[in-house]
Design a protein with these regions (language model features):
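ATP/nucleoside-binding phosphotransfer catalytic cores, i.e., glycine-rich phosphate-binding loops
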Residues: 238-308
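Conserved beta-alpha junction segments in alpha/beta enzyme cores
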Residues: 10-16, 172-208
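N-terminal glycine-rich "phosphate-gripper" loop used for MgATP/nucleotide binding
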Residues: 65-76, 80-81, 100
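Internal helical hairpin/lid segments
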Residues: 196-255
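A short helix->loop->beta-strand "cap" motif at the edges of active sites that frequently abuts
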Residues: 62-63, 88-96, 116, 233-234, ...
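ATP/NTP phosphate-donor binding region
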Residues: 1-62
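Short, acidic/small-residue loops that bind anionic groups at enzyme active sites
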Residues: 84-109, 117-124
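Conserved anion/nucleotide-ligand pocket segment
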Residues: 115-184
């Protein structure tokens, strides 16, 4: 496993060290560990350092899995100078690259520029470091991450009531799986780093976010709706929207209210499915961004499969 730190610096200097130690105990050789110590203002190093580290991915051995240290902010600064084609060639040769949150901007930029597949999944600090009294990475996360890395496969059934489904209440869809952090994705609308309507036509869009009040979630979803992104999909998957706070003046307005306001404006043949185990949470799937996926759904949940 080759670590990169292209976004924010660690909030707790012990977190990456704990994650590295746990991975080593599992028999994983962890490379480029020195990146976890870099600090430049709020970033994990200067722009030049972080850009060089990202572009260095093009030269890595194909049996290596690349994992980002954490999210935050920082990759937007680098987009114009990333060597997209060279990194895509390394992926074509077998390299796998994983992260989420701010890393969404790299994944969607790479998809827009080259069509290369990356993995939306765990990162070092949150997913492999101390959670509570001990280092206990989520078993579900670890199992699906290993399956993605070793078998290049996603196969999961989610049992969760589906309140946003319209009739028909069951069906099947297939399409390119893509998406990530909603705030990051919405910020790419109108830029060359968001995959085009042609690229994502009939796609399966997955979304998550953290620390965003439901009205902000609604506003960003409305932006994607008005930009033609949502109605261009064959399905929309909602992951975790966590760590927000409701206020007295919400008067019953909830995350469900926000999603329903957007959902009712979508064509009835586009299922909006919730409960995807993905986001800023311990239990998360590893999702292939840019790969074909297949979903079967009804009012009690859905299954998702992909092989890449």
């Amino acid at each position: 496993m080759h670590l990169i730190a292209p976004s924010g610096a660690s909030l707790d200097a012990s977190s990456p060290l704990q994650g590295i130690e746990w991975l080593q105990k599992q028999g994983v050789e962890v490379l480029n560990t020195e990146c976890v110590n870099r600090v430049e203002q709020r970033f994990a190093g200067s722009d030049a350092e972080r850009l060089a580290e990202v572009n260095q991915l093009a030269k890595l051995s194909p049996e290596i899995a690349v994992v980002a240290m954490r999210g935050g902010y920082g990759l937007h600064r680098l987009l114009a100078d990333i060597q997209w084609s060279a990194i895509a060639k390394a992926i074509q040769n077998g390299l796998q690259i994983c992260g989420h949150s701010d890393f969404t901007v790299f994944q969607l930029g790479l998809l827009a520029k080259t069509g290369a597949v990356t993995l939306a999944g765990p990162m070092l600090n949150f997913d492999f470091a101390c959670q509570g009294d001990s280092i206990t990475p989520n078993a579900f996360m670890w199992a699906h991450f290993q399956k993605a890395i070793n078998e290049r496969k996603l196969d999961c059934t989610i049992q969760a009531a589906q309140p946003f489904l319209k009739k028909p209440v069951q069906g099947k869809v297939s399409g390119m799986l893509w998406g990530g952090n909603l705030t990051v994705l919405a910020g790419l609308v109108g830029t060359p780093y968001l995959p085009t309507q042609e690229q994502t036509h009939g796609g399966i869009l997955f979304l998550e976010d953290v620390n965003e009040h439901p009205y902000r979630i609604e506003r960003m979803l409305m932006q994607l709706l008005d930009a033609g992104v949502l109605e261009n999909q064959s399905a929309i998957l909602l992951g975790g929207f966590s760590a927000y706070r409701l206020y007295d003046n919400d008067r019953g307005y909830t995350l469900e209210s926000a999603i329903e306001a957007v959902s009712k404006r979508l064509p009835g043949n586009i299922p909006v499915l919730s409960g995807l185990p993905f986001g800023h949470q311990a239990e998360k799937l590893t999702l292939p961004v840019g790969a074909q996926a297949h979903i079967q759904y009804d009012e009690s949940g859905f299954s998702i499969q992909s092989q890449w």
